[in-house]
Amino acid sequence: MQSRKCENGLNFFRKRTTILHFYTLPAVALVISFQTLLISCVEHRKFDDNTVIVHMLAEPKGLHPVNNNDGYQRMIQQCTQKKLMTLDLASGKLMPDALESAPIIQSDSLSYTCVLNKGMRWDNGKEVTAADAIFSIKALVCPGIEASDMKSIFANVESVDADPNNPYAFTLRMKKKYFDNANLLSYVVLLQRAFWDPNDLLGRYNFKQLADETITASFQKQEVAFLNAFNHPDKARVANQMDGLGPYKLETWNSGSEIILKKKVNWWGDASVLPQNQNNPERIIFKVIREMEPLILALKREEIDFTPELSAPALLRLQGKSGFNASYFSGITNSFSYTYMGMNMKPEAGRVPYFMNRQVRRAMALIMPVDEIIAVITKGKAYPISGFILPGQADYDPNQKQLQHDLEQAKSLLTDAGWTDTDGDNIRDKIIDGKRVPFSFSLSYMISPVTGELVQLIKNAYYSVGIEIKPEGLEFSAFYEQAYAHKFDAMLGAWSSSTQPEDPRQIWHSESWSNGGSNFVGFGNAYSDSLIEAANSELNPAKRKMLMHEIQHIVQDEQPYVFLFNATRKYALHKRFGNDTLYRERPHIWFGALNTDTK
């Protein structure tokens, strides 16, 4: 589930044209002509090496296999790591990755027996065994290891034990029945125990002990040193400090520019025919380009092989060029991602409680000009949504209706909640703790080619009813650091999921707020938590769907998010790979399967 600039000569002249527009028309024509000449004379890339270049709008915070968890990290991890189970991009279903087959579920529906593929080897030549898998699972719950999201996801695991008769087998036992227990295995990235924990310190503790946060009180110097080493920033960025089972390894990370992966020599899976094990390119470069103008120029120069992150205007502009169409497949593919505005329902001390009142949150949803946003920002290439489960997902409720834009109702709700303009400055205000407070909140967002325009459109809409928005643009990692720390008034974010049944615990359970998880806004109470727990323990799909529908209705009624739209992916894929098969599931393509020998 889940899960999401630079200047150059071209951009410089575009900005200069805007300035010169206010002076003389000949000057404008001169600059435009020079810009056109610059574009028409771009030097194309030479395809003399077996390299695939993939575009990213931002770089990940890190590539730590446990502690980092964002869309860009997972995209690169597809090439460098192996999970016990992984998502089949074509079918949207789980399939074995490091396991030889799907886990065997025992009759009690609580025990899952797993057997690893034989013959998998680490970079030092050592064979992968169940000891590595058990260490990998323990690391996800160990106090002091910085994987807060994983701790809530693995809260249902009671034990993990090796098979004394088979060095490749182990059994997970769950505390209680859970609708998607097997899906937990898709979160387990295999770690080499000898590399990460050479003294086998976690081997001294069973799973139950490690799942207890108080165990840290008994940790000695050795354990503290292990935690510091495990969490060290070098383990997320420095090539020789990283280890993985995938067909590629980190060669170079040029911060803010590119991440270069190199194909491993004599990799254990070279003979595999599975799509996730293909390693056709010698190198895969993940190149960071944050703005559309430089990206457009890079595509004209054929410096990018694949991007799923074109804006709608950029795609339409490129598709109007015959040279681009001759070199690239391009189009739109659906996704399981949505954009939202989250409102802080539990602000920290000292922060104005703008959104603790449900009427205010509903007013915010009624003000949001969703149809205009879709028309202007996405050029009609997105879909309005009513909640966090999207069409095509298992528990989608087709009867849940989207809220309609209604400024008059919004104004009435704001007035009823005490927000009125008492001083005639066109901004509503309210007496809070004896002080007049203007409705002037900060909206944090991740800087990207489209969010600036989107935020300005939103800002104008809310100002029309007496609410001031103060935009706060942040880089990718800073944005999510702020979100996890709950240090925001409102945030413009996005979640990505899959066809797999949704576990609402990660985003909507109150524990995921208190323990630093992904419930950024502080949604939830005892009743909604109980519904989430009931849905997660219900093995009957029809009964579970009813519970999930009720959870969706509560979320819509409480309005912690203003749901904006289900995004589509605007992509370009170089034709030298011979086909344009893209999948709805992220990252939409198996990078190692791209065959650069096809001309």
Identify what each model region corresponds to:
Residues M1-L20:
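N-terminal secretory signal peptides that target proteins for export/translocation
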Residues T24-T36:
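Bacterial N-terminal signal peptides
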Residues F34-N50:
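Bacterial Sec-dependent signal peptides at the C-terminal "C-region" and cleavage site
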Residues C41-K46, A90, N117-S148, S159-D163, ...:
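Extracytoplasmic/periplasmic ligand-capture domains
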Residues H55-S107, K138, D243:
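N-terminal lobe/hinge region of extracytoplasmic solute-binding protein
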Residues S152-A225:
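Surface-exposed binding/hinge segments that line
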Residues Y571-K599:
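Long beta-strand-rich cores associated with HINT superfamily self-processing modules
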